[in-house]
Amino acid sequence: MQYIVVTGGVISGLGKGTITSSIGHILKDSGFKVSSVKIDPYINYDAGTMNPYQHGEVFVLDDGSEVDLDLGNYERFMDINLSWKNNITTGKVYLEVIEKERHGDYLGKTVQIIPHITDEIKRRIRDVATSSKADFVLIEVGGTVGDIESMPFLEAVRQLKREENNVIFAHVTLVPEIGPTEEQKTKPTQHSVKALREIGIQPDIIFARSKNRLLEETKKRISLFTDVPEGGIISVYDVENVYLLPEVMVNEGFISYLSKLSGKEIKYRDSWKAYTENIKHPKDRVKIAIVGKYVDLHDAYISHKEAFSHVTGNTGIAVDIKWLDSEKVKDDQSMLSDVDAILIPGGFGYRGVEGKIAATRFALENHIPFLGICLGFQVAVIEIARDIIGLQNANSTEFDPATKYPVIDILPEQKGIKDLGGTMRLGSKKVLIKDGTLAKRIYGTDTIYERHRHRYEVNPNYISIIEKAGFVFSGTDEDGIRMEILEKKGDESFIATQYHSEFKSRPLNPSRVHLHLVQQALIYKKNKDIGEAVKLRSSV
């Protein structure tokens, strides 16, 4: 078993997570069993209560863990399912150590960063290695070398190499290109590696992030000042889509160099070849609006963005996302007039909800393909109740506790719960699909398992009323009590789900509802183009 530790220097946001994921994909595609660990140096226990503007999307695993979005990248690139063990935070580590101290596990010793905190970090890393039985365990250390929050984790992985001698260190740095000649500057990388060496870590590989491919002269200079052989300086230049990165790394000689370091023969099968060709050379394009309240930070909805990439890779239909602030859509639905489909993603809180309801109404009135996810499912129910059934001011008790028509209400088991972290209906749940429905045609089966993250549900008192209005709840939980899928009778282009199908979308197995939305968007676009052509001819 081999550990590969990925650290980052110079600045944050260089793409450590994507590089780690790409390493994992290359190894998995070469026949190795892989697992991964994301170390987040924040004191939060997990990502569950974080504002998306602070940290991007909260990703949900099968076991209900609310984790950093990088674990979503790991699952997608490596096609594996992870658990709570794969996300280590300062909060988890310190809480465990403090609880052990309270239990008397340290026998009266003074509890310190070294050895108690570092030992707990190593224990958690080794637990992943043991339980996964992986050939390679990838460890991404969040933050930037030099950050005070990361120091205990860097010390722990330094000790790990000293104790086991099966650790490869990979360091991600920035090579800026300055001036009109775009001269590649190596000084930031030199200083970053120097800072890493000062804490006892010598990188074995350097992933140099840059706008353009590294010049050979640049590689030689980095090698001279870092003691990393030129073959270990891997140029990671900008690509139009993250799924093209493994191909770049392979072409830059990463496989042969890693084979030498690990002593293992790595034979890459390139199972994504057709997939990446579709991404590079799509044959059609559609425009889909994502209407949310965190659209200024696209990472808040990264799993939807990636799900559309997966559809492109499998169909050759490229998706141009139009990011729309739901608060602005509330007052101006004309923003939606040029799109081929509308997606309403999940979310919490009242802000922006009326805009999402307005977008749903616009889709229904104009027969635009529609997909609602989680809160998007709930606002679809609210819109149907208000404007089709006529229940004026129908709402969710989340937004209006005193509403006359509470078509969405809190889950019974959620009543009385005060804590926010880890208390929702979370993780993979069984969904039963009814025969003769659009959902059955989309999935081709009567049972699926999808990931959830919600506190509210369709009020059972309104189910029959909604279905009498021309809609059908085509999916339920395994008890048939909780509504999971909503569709419009006789309409192939309207569907909403309580679950988050984007969390299980993979490059070679895209989310079925995202795939369906894109296919419907293309039909809508072509019909619209035909209609416009007919109008043009008739006016001549």
Curated annotation (Swiss-Prot):
EC number of the protein: 6.3.4.2
Residue ranges of every copy of the Glutamine amidotransferase type-1 domain listed in the record: 294-527
Binding site for L-glutamine: Y53, G347, L375, G376, F377, Q378, E398, R455
SUPFAM superfamilies: Class I glutamine amidotransferase-like (SSF52317), P-loop containing nucleoside triphosphate hydrolases (SSF52540)
MF-aspect GO terms: ATP binding; CTP synthase activity; glutaminase activity; identical protein binding; metal ion binding
Pfam families listed in its UniProt record: CTP_synth_N, GATase
Root EC class: ligase
Gene Ontology annotations of biological process type: 'de novo' CTP biosynthetic process; pyrimidine nucleobase biosynthetic process
Region Amidoligase domain: start-end pairs: 1-264
Name of the protein: CTP synthase
Subunit structure of this chain's protein: Homotetramer.
InterPro entries from the UniProt entry: Class_I_gatase-like, CTP_synthase, CTP_synthase_N, GATASE, GATase1_CTP_Synthase, P-loop_NTPase
Other remarks on this protein: CTPSs have evolved a hybrid strategy for distinguishing between UTP and CTP. The overlapping regions of the product feedback inhibitory and substrate sites recognize a common feature in both compounds, the triphosphate moiety. To differentiate isosteric substrate and product pyrimidine rings, an additional pocket far from the expected kinase/ligase catalytic site, specifically recognizes the cytosine and ribose portions of the product inhibitor.
Alphabetical keyword list: ATP-binding, Glutamine amidotransferase, Ligase, Magnesium, Metal-binding, Nucleotide-binding, Pyrimidine biosynthesis
Binding site residues for UTP: S12, K185, T186, K187, P188, T189, Q190, R221
Binding site for CTP: S12, D147, I148, E149, K185, T186, K187, P188, T189, Q190, R221
Catalyzed chemical reaction(s): UTP + L-glutamine + ATP + H2O = CTP + L-glutamate + ADP + phosphate + 2 H(+); L-glutamine + H2O = L-glutamate + NH4(+); UTP + NH4(+) + ATP = CTP + ADP + phosphate + 2 H(+)
Record: residues binding ATP: G13, L14, G15, K16, G17, T18, D70
Top-level lineage group: Archaea
Catalytic-site annotation from UniProt: C374 (nucleophile), H500, E502
